């Protein structure tokens, strides 16, 4: 009995259907390859957004810029938010030493207008029963590029009131000094050292005011806008 005369094994319906689908897919691939050889390449399907952009570009019309979200109007009769109540307590105590509250939705803050009062304000923020800002979450140095340096402090009252508030303190680049709050919030210790290392801000009263990332004899402060990398450090070329 020849190979052709041998009975072929009977396939299960599921396997037969699977093999038929594979054969159909293979035939479709061969047809696609043949059409490509003939110069017909399949076109990529564009997303609706990309198709609209291409149509606008073709017609010479620029896509309109999306409207910026408008700030919600402030309801003067509403109950104050927790951070607003906290600010009012601070403002009542220190008056003109602090600015008005910038009540933006992302990071409401006030500015310390009298830098000499900053330690007293900080201590009050931590100790007053109505405030209890027991956690300094972050401290960030900033070079504003107009002769001013500054520090942005983010505070939380984790144990009690659950409110948050941000404080900004400025100093001049010629005399960059701000009172330290490292003995009020322990987390400020290394944060202040980093701000000193990167911006040259001296935190007066800090227990260990020295660089924390760069070598002690490094030239300049790397995050200032006018910083220029030194070319050689102890005979070693500085890569940049």
Swiss-Prot record:
Biased composition, class Low complexity, residue ranges: 11-20
Compositionally biased residues, Basic and acidic residues: 67-82
Enzyme class, broadest EC rank: translocase
UniProt xrefs under SUPFAM superfamilies: Nqo5-like (SSF143243)
UniProt key word Ubl conjugation: no
Gene Ontology annotations for the cellular component aspect, listed alphabetically: plasma membrane
Location within or outside the cell: Cell inner membrane
GO molecular function, one term: quinone binding
Membrane topology: Peripheral membrane protein
Catalytic activity annotation: a quinone + NADH + 5 H(+)(in) = a quinol + NAD(+) + 4 H(+)(out)
NCBIfam families linked: NuoC_fam (TIGR01961)
Family: Belongs to the complex I 30 kDa subunit family.
UniProt name for this protein: NADH-quinone oxidoreductase subunit C
Originating species: Chloroherpeton thalassium (strain ATCC 35110 / GB-78)
């Amino acid at each position: 009995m020849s190979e052709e005369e041998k009975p072929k094994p009977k396939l299960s319906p599921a396997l037969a259907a699977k093999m038929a689908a594979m054969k159909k897919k293979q035939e479709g691939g061969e047809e696609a390859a043949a059409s490509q050889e003939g110069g017909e390449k399949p076109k990529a399907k564009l997303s609706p957004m990309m198709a609209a952009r291409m149509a606008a570009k073709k017609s010479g019309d620029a896509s309109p810029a999306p409207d910026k979200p408008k700030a919600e109007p402030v309801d003067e009769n509403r109950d104050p938010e927790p951070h607003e109540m906290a600010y009012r307590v601070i403002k009542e105590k220190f008056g003109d030493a602090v600015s008005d509250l910038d009540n933006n939705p992302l990071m409401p803050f006030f500015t310390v207008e009298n830098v000499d009062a900053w330690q007293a304000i900080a201590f009050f923020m931590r100790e007053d029963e109505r405030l209890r800002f027991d956690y300094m979450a972050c401290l960030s140095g900033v070079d504003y590029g107009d002769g001013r340096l500054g520090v942005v402090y983010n505070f939380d009252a984790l144990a009690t009131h659950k409110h948050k508030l941000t404080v900004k303190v400025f100093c001049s680049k010629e005399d960059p000094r701000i009172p330290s709050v490292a003995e009020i919030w322990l987390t400020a210790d290394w944060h202040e050292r980093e701000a000193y290392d990167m911006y040259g801000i001296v935190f007066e009263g800090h227990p260990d005011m020295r660089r924390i990332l760069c070598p002690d004899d490094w030239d300049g402060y790397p995050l200032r806008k006018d910083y220029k990398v030194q070319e050689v450090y102890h005979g070693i070329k500085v890569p940049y």
